[in-house]
Amino acid sequence: MAQDLLLEIGVEEMPSAYMPRVLKDLKDLAQKNLAEARLSCGEVLTLGTPRRLCLWVKEISEEQEDSLLENRGPKKSIAFDANGNPSKAGLGFARSQGVDFRELQIREVSGVEYLFAIKKEKGQAAEQILPGLLLKVIHSLSFPKSMTWSYYQTRFARPIRWLLAIFGDKNVEFNIENIKSANYTYGHRFLSTGVLLVTSIDDYFRVLREHYVILDQAERKKMIWQQVQKVAGEAGGKAMENEELLEEVAFLVEFPTAFYGEFSPSYLDVPPEVLTTSMIEHQRYFPVYNNEGRLLPGFVGVRNGTDYCLDIVRAGNERVLKARLEDALFFWNEDSRKSLEEMSAKLKNVLFHERLGTLADKVLRLQKLALFIGQQTGLGQPEKLQRSALLCKADLMSNMVYEFPELQGIMGRYYASGSAEEPEVAEAIFEHYLPRFAGDKLPSSAGGIVLSLAEKMDNLMGCFSIGIKPSGSQDPYALRRQALGLVNIILDKKLSIDLKLVFEQAYLGYKDIDLEKSREDSVKELLDFIYQRMRGVLLDNGISYDVVDAALSRPSFDLFETYYRAFKLQEFKKSPVFEDFMVVYNRVHNLSRKWESEEIDLDLLVDESEKNLCQKLPGLQEDIKKSLIAQDYTRALELLAALRADIDQFFTAVMVMVDDERLKAARLGILKSIANMFNSIADFSKIV
């Protein structure tokens, strides 16, 4: 009869950021190891709090499935003597396998016959397998950072304090260092005392709840959000949903209780982003807003415990937040006394990168590159682009951004507005960092778009030119994110821009620096890197992999043109004339792929079908060229598909690979001319 398995790893408080990943890994490792152990099971669940990781596997089979072991022995020619009797080698193999020679089988492997011993191995009881299996699962868990404790060698995210393991109604016995698995657990650190005996899996969940532990993280999240909404509503406001904060708080507490706190309205003079950053990033509070979306002088915090002495908890949290907001107000007032130009003057004292100069050097590069991109795209006014680039890094010298680095750009916009800079300049200063993370908004103003592209292209070129590029999971300079941001901006804004030209210009910005790589190598590597991101974007947008391969195989440095062409190819693939199109392509491509010349000696052509086809080529080539310039890819594709009848007639009437070399060359020239029209759109040999 199948039984449930429960494992609880009791630990010191785990970092909340580790929890989602480790619970997923725990589930995956359990499923993988159970399958490898030939133990069938039902649903696998992982639950967790800061102090415990729980694995619950339903309906594990009582014993392993039986298995067949196949061991290969000597060749048949060696296993038998000349008279067909078992040789010493054959008998020795049977003896080593513990089977009678007559039970051996003869099987062919790669044309050679061998002896095989087929043995049935009976599965072991699950309770014999599980101790080693659970040990393996626990030791296989990995973390961003791990530690040892006491004098032990085991590494884990935090010290392991207890282990509970139950299979059905029995303990699963194993130990890690001096910690032995048992049938007891512990409740809430402050609201429960002593050991809690667990007699069954059902009993485990009941006991924890009675001792102030809500084990299911999904239930805790739901409780927290309901309480936060209720508390904020009672204070006359509302909390904005923040999934990331909600998940983090859920993994900080075992028994959540929300409370409302207040701060002085005078702090509302500080930009709201500063206040919410203090509340969310530093204190894990939920800011409270009125119905118009304006920040109120209050917050909702979540306590790890009951409502006992909640007023004292509230007062303590208000004191901590007040200290932070007092600092923020001071920074705001101090920074507001300086202009952005004063701050910008200090950039010469700060390194952008030890091998790429100072931030002041970077600003000069951005000014030149922004002008160049503005000319390429027709976006922005030169003087405003220059001004935006000059001031875009100035807020890095402010007290506020030094204290709150995540507010770079945001504070720059406020300081620019306070310094009477034009609105377009202030907006570009903020937007040049966009997008900052996956799913973030893209820049929308002309200056913001240009400066954001310049920022990312300069960063990418600088890193690639000194040999810094992502490898595996390592990407310390977030180059993948910046490249993807660049791609998304270009596609979203439908910008036609020659990336090769702009990257070459970006390289020139580093002309006074001793770079590791040449301009040609740097630009080539960067374009390859960008098109790897482009490939992912195309696939994510529903373009089939073969169409993506076909479109990307034709060199183009215009990302939007490539995207639009791939989209039209995908659309055309569903067209009723697509079959005609591919027939024409395959017939001309297969014969002409090794032929280079489009030269055709008209005097050598003898059949009307080849003369007719040849006469159509100049007009067709001109029409295809015009269609590609106009990016009317559908028309170009349909024109080529319309050649089906002419191509069929051509191949019916003439033989291309004739003995007459000059005639063969003329006919291959016709086919190559047609093939090259296909190749000017995409590499259709990739289509499946």
UniProtKB/Swiss-Prot annotation:
Q: Name one Pfam family in it.
A: tRNA_synt_2f
- Top enzyme class: ligase
* Keywords, in A-Z order: Aminoacyl-tRNA synthetase, ATP-binding, Cytoplasm, Ligase, Nucleotide-binding, Protein biosynthesis
Entries under SMART domains matching the protein: DALR_1
Q: Where is this protein chiefly located?
A: cytoplasm
User: Which Gene3D superfamilies does the UniProt record give?
Assistant: Isoleucyl-tRNA Synthetase, Domain 1 (1.10.730.10)
Q: Name one GO molecular function term.
A: glycine-tRNA ligase activity
**Biological-process GO terms, alphabetical:** arginyl-tRNA aminoacylation; glycyl-tRNA aminoacylation
The record's subcellular location field reads: Cytoplasm
Gene Ontology annotations for the cellular component aspect, listed alphabetically:
cytosol
Q: Do the record's keywords include ATP-binding?
A: yes
| Assembly behavior | Tetramer of two alpha and two beta subunits.
Can you say what this protein is called? Glycine--tRNA ligase beta subunit
Protein's gene: glyS
